[in-house]
Structures are given as structure tokens and as C-alpha cells.
Amino acid sequence: MTRTVAAPPVCVLGLGLIGGSIMRAAAAAGREVFGYNRSVEGAHGARSDGFDAITDLNQTLTRAAATEALIVLAVPMPALPGMLAHIRKSAPGCPLTDVTSVKCAVLDEVTAAGLQARYVGGHPMTGTAHSGWTAGHGGLFNRAPWVVSVDDHVDPTVWSMVMTLALDCGAMVVPAKSDEHDAAAAAVSHLPHLLAEALAVTAAEVPLAFALAAGSFRDATRVAATAPDLVRAMCEANTGQLAPAADRIIDLLSRARDSLQSHGSIADLADAGHAARTRYDSFPRSDIVTVVIGADKWREQLAAAGRAGGVITSALPSLDSPQ
């Protein structure tokens, strides 16, 4: 027999671009939402816009524990250990998720804090080059992929809660193992930051380049406008996957350079790149509808469906007696 998991209050820790957008989107969906922000400016901005936000972390976590809220960690990676220590002390029984762009490193920190049993990793694959409360908006996640981890430890009830939050925010849920997420994020999220930085630096060294720069340069360097400390936090936390991805790019560029110098041609790279982009444009996305959360091998089924392009756009049912 299946059931629908109740949607608990949402406690957002960190009200920047992503956390602030979650607060807005979840509230718009009718969820009870409250949050914490370290800076007075961010918390005041949220309150001025009609949201429930304070700068007292202990008070926020006490409320989360009392209401059994789903805690959303929306702070930079370097701040995680300290934040997890506070959660372990004040709200250890609360379900827990995050929005960090790496998953294995976060899982390691959560495990070290003794909070693994109630944790399900998350990563909304969206954003802008801006940060802070004022950068967020309630529509940020509309039709965006939102990874929800299906690692072996995840509790089905907590997983359902995180899935429901993502859906309430307007996202499409992509189930994935943490290590597979990190490999993919290195290629499609973190490596583009390195390339954008390198391209911006290269152009800055060429006289007249900025005067001639137009759409292709603007699009290719958009994420270079991101605050350097945020870029470092996401990229350096995924070193194990980003370094080999960078090696692959360097190899491709080196081969193209050698071919250009020797034969006056970049045909191999241009053809391969065009073919890969065409595959991306036609990549199939199908709705995942047959998996029951908590049923036998449900995690493996969701991971396989995610690899194949499957997404969840409507809440999946859960067993009465999760496994």
C-alpha cells in the first residue's frame, strides 16, 4: 500500500541567490518557510519582502527542531562544518538537505557530523552570476533540473520530502548517485567556470578585444562574473572530478592547436563538438512514474532512470512500510 509523505515546514539556512529563491518559491507554493541569514542585510531584506527570517541561528534551529522542519543548507561549502555542528547540537533529528554543487564532499561532512541518517543531498542546476537575497526570485527553478541523491544510505521518507520541496519550487527532479553527480557537474558546471575565466583573461590581454566583443564572448564568459570566492568554493570542492575533466579539455585543445599549426585545420574538434552539441539538443527526457519510493531496489531504479534522462515532474508514491 502506498502513501503520500506529508510536507513539513522548510527551514532555509542561508538566504543568498539559491536559498532566498527557495524561500520565495516554497512560500509561493503554500509551504511554511522560515530562515536564517548571517548578514543583517540579507535577513532584513527578506523580512522587508514579507518573509520570516532572522540572524539568530540558535533560535532558528530550535524552531526547526520543534516543528520537525526540513532543513535546507544553503551556505557555501567552507561554512558547512560549522553549520553542521550547530545542527547536531540543536536539531539532530530534523530531515536535512543542501543545495551545494558537489555531493560527495558534502556527504563526507554530514557523515563526520553524525547526521547521515537524516540527510539527502540536493543540487538545483540553475543560477546567475549574482549573489545575495536581492539576486533571488521565485521563478529561478522553473523547469530546472534539481538533483536529489539516491545514495545507499538515504531514508525514503526524507527523500520524498526533498523531492516534494524541489517539485514545489517548480523544478524537475533528477535522481542520481553522489559520485555520478560530481562527475557530471565537473563537466557541465565547474569546467565551464574555468573556461570562462581563462577566456576572459586571454581576451583581456589582446588590444581591441573588448571593443569588438559581442554575443559569443558575452555568453561564453557570463559565469566569469561570479564572485571568485564562490567559484573557488564549488570548483575546489570537486577537485577529484574537475582535474581529469580539465585534462580532457587541455588534450582536446592541444590536439586542435597542433592540427592548426601543422595542417591549418581544426576540423576534428569542430566536427566532434558540433556532433556532441546536437546530441545534447536531442537528449531525451522522460517522466519517471513507475518507481515506488521505499520499494525493493528503489534507489537503484531511480539512479538508472536518471542516467537515461528520466525526470520526476509529479511526486512519486511511497510505501507505508519503507525499506
Swiss-Prot record:
UniProt cross-references to Pfam families, sorted A to Z: PDH_C (PF20463), PDH_N (PF02153)
pH and activity: Optimum pH is 7.9.
Temperature dependence of activity: Optimum temperature is 37 degrees Celsius. Is not stable even stored at -80 degrees Celsius. About 50% of the activity is lost when stored at 4 degrees Celsius for 24 hours.
Domain of life: Bacteria
Keywords: Amino-acid biosynthesis, Aromatic amino acid biosynthesis, NAD, Oxidoreductase, Tyrosine biosynthesis
Residue span(s) of domain Prephenate/arogenate dehydrogenase: 8-291
Catalytic activity field: prephenate + NAD(+) = 3-(4-hydroxyphenyl)pyruvate + CO2 + NADH
Enzyme class: oxidoreductase
GO molecular function, one term: prephenate dehydrogenase (NAD+) activity
Regulation: Is inhibited by NaCl; more than half of the enzyme activity is abolished in the presence of 10 uM of NaCl.
EC number assigned by the record: 1.3.1.12
Pathway(s) annotated for this protein in UniProt: Amino-acid biosynthesis; L-tyrosine biosynthesis; (4-hydroxyphenyl)pyruvate from prephenate (NAD(+) route): step 1/1
Biological process annotations from GO: tyrosine biosynthetic process
Protein family (similarity comment): Belongs to the prephenate/arogenate dehydrogenase family.
PANTHER family membership: PREPHENATE DEHYDROGENASE, PREPHENATE DEHYDROGENASE [NADP(+)]
Function: Catalyzes the NAD(+)-dependent conversion of prephenate to p-hydroxyphenylpyruvate, with the elimination of carbon dioxide. Is a key regulatory enzyme in tyrosine biosynthesis. Displays no chorismate mutase (CM) activity, in contrast to TyrA from E.coli and some other bacteria, that are bifunctional and possess a CM domain.
Protein name, UniProt field: Prephenate dehydrogenase
Gene (UniProt): tyrA
